[in-house]
């Protein structure tokens, strides 16, 4: 699924982060390396950004534009659960940029359940090992659909129990 985009643009990496300034600044080297490796520009959606020369800083991005930017990205780089989940649901190649000691259980859980833990980049050196950023979403979508069915069943049971009391 690709959402319509009213902007004609060259392929890009979308970097979406709500982390603090220091963490985003550390991620800049990873983003530069990915951009150089795959010949892509970077579009940034962050609260604020240190000076950079590798892309475009986007401001005032509303919900429609946000979804369109993710859907039309060549690669999404994020540290956000929602950025990760949307990339998976929309079938967009992605990387989670975070340090090894970060324990965001929502992100880690979904990545583990879908066998996508290799999509975590913790250092600039790890970019060297990336040969192809594409993801085969066929098997992932099967697993994702099973997880969604299980969640739906759980919610239906929970709501029925609550309605009887």
Q: What feature does the model see in each segment?
A:
Residues 1-165:
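Active-site anion-handling motifs in enzyme catalytic cores
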